[in-house]
Amino acid sequence: LAKMKIEQKYLNEDDVGFMIAPRLNAASRMDNPMKAYELLSTDDEIKAGTIADHLSKINDDRKTMVASIMREVNSKFGKSPLREMKEVIVIGNPEWRVGVLGLVAGKISDEHKKPVFVWGKDENDLIKGSCRSDGSVSLVELMTETSEFFLEFGGHEFAGGFTVHNEKIHFLEEALSVSYNKVKRDKIESEIIYDVKSDLSIVNIKNWREIEKMAPFGLANPKPIFLFESVNIENIKKFGKNGSGEHLEITFSDASKNKVKAISFFSNNESFEVPLVVDKKVNLLATFDLSRFRGKEELRLRIVDIL
């Protein structure tokens, strides 16, 4: 925690999910999974510090690798417009590291709202990969329907892993798309799901303290989602480690001149249903977020969606 500048008394589910877990997972994605075990089991502070530094470094390497793969993916998609895409996206490169492909598949699925299969080659020259669903189909059902293409597969309805016959990889997208039309779920009209509708005046420390009493938040206890209708985009700023600009900070205002900052990690101006333009009015879905960066408390919003 000290290495990540997290104060133990303020440790929360976001710190675990976005700071600690990625570093532990980096051990299996980029190195030896035993490194994570050694960190959690050692009583030697010096050894723990050395391992923590190593995991932070390979986690940074993992981020760089994923960003590089995503640039390659976006370049390929630029040559293949969305209207030409199949119902299921299959994309890969023998040079891509298998351990990070689940992260890549998740990003592509979030962006294109389709099931995605991403593959690379492992040290045994086997084509392996990860898949993620947008919720329109169970991946287990989809892969079962297309089982003759796989040497192995497994997972659950939203995420999975697979090994493909080398000679069949170039036909996998077509086969999965045919299977998709057999096992896809009936499309349900999307609706805006939120807990509270309000103006921006509700965003204050007093209300945050009340929300905080319901923590820890997670899958079975999600953070309350607030809907702010017809708020104005005052300012858009990119930020990130070493000037990467991989995150967004947007300032919103409402009719009563209340102003609030809102952030979205790993996002850009094209990440939402509507284009982000200063002075544009939008509907904002967000949760409360208290930052304690460098010991300074700042209440802001975490963007769920912009409509």
Language-model features: where?
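Acidic, two-metal ion nucleic-acid-processing modules in DNA metabolism proteins
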Residues: 1-22, 26-76, 131-307
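Flexible, glycine/threonine-enriched loop-and-boundary segments that flank and lead into catalytic domains
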Residues: 79-106
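Short coil/turn connectors at secondary-structure junctions
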Residues: 84-87, 111-115, 125
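Residues immediately flanking
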Residues: 93-94, 106, 121, 166, ...
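Short glycine-cluster motifs
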Residues: 117-133
